[in-house]
Amino acid sequence: MSEENLRPAYDDQVNEDVYKRGAQSKLTKARKADFDDEKDKKKDNDKHIDKRPKSGPRLDENGNPLPKEPRLPKRKVAVMVGYCGTGYHGMQYNPPNPTIESALFKAFVEAGAISKDNSNDLKKNGFMRAARTDKGVHAGGNLISLKMIIEDPDIKQKINEKLPEGIRVWDIERVNKAFDCRKMCSSRWYEYLLPTYSLIGPKPGSILYRDIEESKTELPGVLDEDLESKEFWEEFKKDANEKFSTEEIEAILAYVPPARDEFDINEELYQKVKKYKQLENAHRRRYRISAAKLAKFRASTSQYLGAHNFHNFTLGKDFKEPSAIRFMKDIKVSDPFVIGDAQTEWISIKIHGQSFMLHQIRKMVSMATLITRCGCPVERISQAYGQQKINIPKAPALGLLLEAPVFEGYNKRLEQFGYKAIDFSKYQDEVDKFKMKHIYDKIYKEEVDENVFNAFFSYIDSFNKVTGAQGEETADKSGPAVQKSIFEFLTAKGIPGLTDAPESNKKIKQRKRMEEEEAASKKAEISSTTQSNEPEVQPEAAAN
């Protein structure tokens, strides 16, 4: 068909306004779409705008800009540090509060490792930490990465001279530009210090003691008979009966402190209560754990090894959340050691895990301690990995410290690029001396002065599970979503219907399969590396 046949028969049949309106409509829609795109882009950009005040040039006392210093080359480095967290508001830079990072940054500037032109902005130096510690928490080893001037061979010594005694730099190592100490940290070692008297069974007459003894009568043979704890409390009772009359002991045990405005420190009964508690504390500090009880505690902590669902060992995690599954690589419980003027016996618990959730370590220590002191079967810990919610109390924060981050996987890449591996074990002697002087001694002293662990476990033993902390009667509810009390969990009866965590949990199986694949891959990598490092035999040499 020709073009002439396609044209309309009459010119008046063509309405030019229609074409104009159509073109205008298309143009309007296109402009509106472009405008909407610009609005969306602006919204996205607003989300990423750094609204914090920007740092300007350095000024002198009169407000005039200071001259810039000559620029020296900066290198990406990993700085290995240790610190006592007492008196600091955590690790992370948080002005105007004193933090570990603010003290380190100030020392870097004063030592010349960071130019004064960059002394008012951490971001200019790419400051990053491997593990963030909270207020008052210590670290024998932690790591920060940043860009630093390291031309001076004595830079480490100069930085340490500018730092307070409670913060030390162990070493400074060059790393490649892509190094991110937080993301490339493959695992972490934590340490928890626990006085052994924490493993003594509940005090006779306490609520938890009565619940345990009643459950033993109903279901004999489930819980251990803790003869060691019975002997301890009998010795204390005998000593107390020699120093106080029966009437005085009854009055002491029934004593309720008055309101603060009515409190009288010189009151005769209060003074007797004070002496009674001092006598009990003296017996606790003289306590020495038996080999059998220490073995029970070690068996309890070993239940955490491997991949498990730790949703009950943190806050705000549901059983079905994949992030609740964590992998514990190793747990070591030391032999008991006596330290300090009070001659208290302690044990050290070291936990090596890929990653940890909020309060996880404190709840793990608390659960293992309660299982041991109440005589429960150690296998009961595996029930806490199941769907049922259980309220596990947190052990005191006092004993917790970061031992060191581990960069096992990334160290291989560093060595390939010609850099030294990040390894805290090279400085173990220095770290141990520092921990003993600036961390352990402070923990021991605070425990003696405040009786932190005694207060915690005394509260657990006397806690009323019916009225709770608010004095309101709790409703009797059932179902896995309803949080159950730890006190039901610790008796011979346990929580009705609660069984070991199901082995068929998909996420746990997937994680275990991943662990096996990772181990096989590492083995193959080591094997191939060994073979590649063997000198090749040249044909000439072979012929000779």
Swiss-Prot record:
This is tRNA pseudouridine synthase 1. Residues 1-74, 495-544 are annotated as: Disordered. Binds 1 zinc ion per subunit. Pfam families: PseudoU_synth_1. Residues 1-10, 31-61, 513-525 have a biased composition (Basic and acidic residues). GO terms for molecular function: mRNA binding; pseudouridine synthase activity; snRNA pseudouridine synthase activity; tRNA pseudouridine synthase activity. GO terms for biological process: mRNA processing; mRNA pseudouridine synthesis; snRNA pseudouridine synthesis; tRNA modification; tRNA pseudouridine synthesis. It is an enzyme of class 5 (isomerase). It is found in: Nucleus. Its cofactor is Zn(2+). Present with 8130 molecules/cell in log phase SD medium. The active site is at 134 (nucleophile). CDD domains: PseudoU_synth_PUS1_PUS2. Keywords: Isomerase, mRNA processing, Nucleus, tRNA processing, Zinc. SUPFAM superfamilies: Pseudouridine synthase.
